[in-house]
A protein has these predicted regions:
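Single conserved hydrophobic/aromatic residue that forms the stacking wall/gate
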Residues: 259-268
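Conserved ATPase-coupling elements of RecA-like P-loop NTPase cores
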Residues: 205-207, 231-238
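Walker A/P-loop
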Residues: 37-55
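A substrate-engagement module of RecA-like helicase motors
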Residues: 1-14, 64-194, 199
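Conserved pre-motif I regulatory segment
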Residues: 2-42
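SF2 helicase catalytic motif II
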Residues: 218-232
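Conserved helix/coil segment N-terminal to the catalytic DExD/H
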Residues: 185, 201-216
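Walker A/P-loop NTP-binding motif
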Residues: 53-64, 85
Length: 268
């Protein structure tokens, strides 16, 4: 594995401007050993170490089912669109790779059609965006809304044309066979390397615990980039919180009960 990071290694040969760094090489060795032994590994690498390549190369060399989780969707897109293809090409990797996000990141064809039919009832700007999205829906391969450049990210049309767990029709949907979410999940199930984000990974844990299926396939190797973000994100899925508003409401309820309930003397 360390040969990939040598001055005459595969990465240096295939990537213009690649310069071997000893910390990067050491990290790659540690990742390789952890994968081979099936042991956990925590790595803290300084800025400029090149940690992405240091875990990607061993992961691809392992020829196992790999899940890579990033701290944000922006990093997820960068890893999938730039870093992973670069290292894959350098190592002549022939496995299948997939990108998987939560359902709200994909265009829902059924909801898009419903909004188009209700066009006359929509505000002008939203209707204009829906029309643009109908055109884009015929061009996009994966329905990933982050790749749509014709409609602004903050457009009020997006919530109307993406789905949630509550409004998704599932297999009863007339557009089910063309569903971008279903296609993305199937591709992930069949892929050798799947790139997800921490939010989706933890949401998958919740789904699996409920016994209602899974969002992410099982894997031999799990890699968490920006793993220090996991505790805070995990608390959103598995923690319990109490807001000041809830405490105030509780205090009001208790006060109301104290003033409206009969005293023990009155109940004799």
């Amino acid at each position: 594995m360390t040969d990939d990071f040598a001055p005459d290694g595969q990465l240096a040969k295939a990537i213009p401007g690649f310069k071997p760094r000893e910390p990067q090489r050491q990290m790659a060795v540690a990742v390789t050993q952890a994968i081979e032994k099936g042991q956990p590994l925590v790595v803290e690498a300084g800025t400029g170490t090149g940690k992405t390549y240091a875990y990607l190369a061993p992961a691809l060399r392992a020829k196992k089912k790999v899940i890579i989780s990033t701290g944000s969707k922006a990093l997820q897109d960068q890893l999938y669109s730039r870093d992973l293809p670069t290292v894959s090409k350098a190592l002549k990797y022939t496995g299948n790779v997939a990108l998987l996000k939560g359902r709200s990141n994909y265009l829902c064809l059924e909801r898009l059609e419903q909004q188009a039919l209700a066009g006359g009832d929509l505000p002008v700007q939203i209707l204009s965006d829906v029309i643009l999205l109908r055109s884009w829906s015929n061009q996009t391969v994966d329905g990933d809304i982050s790749t749509c450049v014709s409609v602004a990210e903050d457009s009020q049309a997006w919530p109307l044309v993406t789905s949630t767990n509550d409004n998704c029709l599932g297999s009863d949907c007339p557009m089910y066979k063309d569903c971008f979410v279903v296609k993305a999940r199937k591709k992930a199930m069949d892929a050798d390397v799947v790139v997800v984000n921490h939010h989706l990974f933890l949401a998958d844990m919740v789904v699996k615990e409920s016994g209602f299926g899974e969002l992410i396939p099982e894997a031999d190797v799990m890699i968490f980039d920006e793993a220090h973000q996991l505790p805070d994100i995990a608390s959103q899925y598995f923690g319990q919180s109490l807001s000041s508003r809830q405490l105030l409401d509780l205090a009001k309820d208790i006060t109301c009960l104290l003033y409206t309930s009969p005293s023990p003397r009155d109940t004799r």
